[in-house]
Amino acid sequence: MSETQVKQKVREFYDQIGWQQVSSGLYQNARYEDLRPVSRQYIHRCHLRVNRHLAPQGDFLLDAGSGPVQYPEYLTYSQGYRYRVCADISIQALREARKRLGERGLYVVADVANLPFRQEVFDGVVSLHTLHHLPLGEQKQAYHELYRVLKGGRSLAVVNGWTDSPLMRRLSWLVRLMETIGKAVARLRGRETLPEKTVKTAETPSSSTPTGTFVEKLDAGWLRRELSDLQPQIWVWRSVSVRFLRAVIHRVLGGRLWLWLLYALEERFPHYFGEKGQYPLIVIHKPKG
């Protein structure tokens, strides 16, 4: 599948399915997130980590691949800005974003690897679960595009997903065990479990050919090697996958306590869990001048 075809499939998915509301404020794409009460506080605190790396105020915040800005925490990123510029390949995403942001948003249909903005115009840049849709070569280009439009003395924050998380690989036996137990319990209770979507990176529509073919793995080594000129820092956004949360974390098993402990460990060792966990928070600072 060509790069153009990949982008077309992504656009069609989000226009026709992913960003269609199924209830108030809830989108089809929500099935790629764990929205259960047991995980709610952990997910909430992970979302807020982005704020630590953005300038608290400015004129324009670029949200590259904004989607509909679907979670309340996402709105906090631009609270101190005059405008949030939402750039997305999906027109449906931008329609939904307008419902949330109104006049405080500006909306542009755009490819994040080829941004239609002049250099150094944004006081902050954020991109959440977007770059993994691109082939690896274009991911590198997209990082440089985000850097190009960022003002000097400011930082950009990108939440992405590794194609192969060492931590999740080590814990895969536990996930399989808990999924087996869960199916057995569901059968005993006389109900079927919903099939789980196996996701190696982040919230993404699947295709017969993995995005960018991934002859090279998207991991910390790739990032440092390909973006050495930008000097990226790797922090933790969230170390465990949606599949892990759904399989292992349950209220009756003390799920909230386990997630509290996990969050504390992530805070204590943010770079380790950023490199080894599922979802890194990649921060790049642009010097002045």
Task: Locate the predicted segments by residue.
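Conserved class I S-adenosyl-L-methionine
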Residues: 1-55, 70-74, 157-187
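Class I SAM-dependent methyltransferase SAM/SAH-binding core
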Residues: 62, 67-114
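A conserved beta-strand element that flanks and buttresses the S-adenosyl-L-methionine
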Residues: 126
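Short catalytic micro-motifs in class I SAM-dependent methyltransferases
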Residues: 129-130
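A short glycine-rich, Lys/Arg-flanked "PGG" loop and its adjoining helix->strand segment in the class I
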Residues: 140-152
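A C-terminal cap/extension of S-adenosyl-L-methionine-dependent methyltransferases
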Residues: 202-205, 221, 225, 232-289
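Acceptor-substrate binding/catalytic loop of class I
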Residues: 205-221
